[in-house]
Amino acid sequence: MKKLILILLSALMFTGCAGASNHQTHTYRQITMDEAVTMMAQEADYIILDVRRPDEFAEGHIPNAINVANEIIGTADIPELPDKEQLIMVYCRSGRRSKEASEKLVKLGYTNIVEFGGILDWTGEIVTE
């Protein structure tokens, strides 16, 4: 009887562990600047998200980027990002805030986030407002 209980407890423990390992957590992908440029050329439906402050954005940003400051993400709904499954490509000045923002977006339920660092490494066109 003790052997049977031991076997059942062991089986239950392994089943519980197997169930936990099947739980998938969403995360963002980090890509290089070159990969981002390639992705922008190949994809059709994506958003380029600049998470710097509005004054930094006005000084120069990647063409067609929208600005939602990192400090705002997580404090309220983001009307500029209504589709939580859409590809969102995130950048900032150096890469620190874009990583923070990407983590926050994932926690908010966004499922297709790529982070590609900072505009300091951007070699393409920059537009000002």
Q: Which residues fall in each region the model found?
A:
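Rhodanese-like catalytic fold shared by cysteine-dependent sulfurtransferases
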Residues: 4-6, 17-39, 46, 55-87, ...
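Hydrophobic beta-strand scaffold positions of dinucleotide-using enzymes
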Residues: 48-50
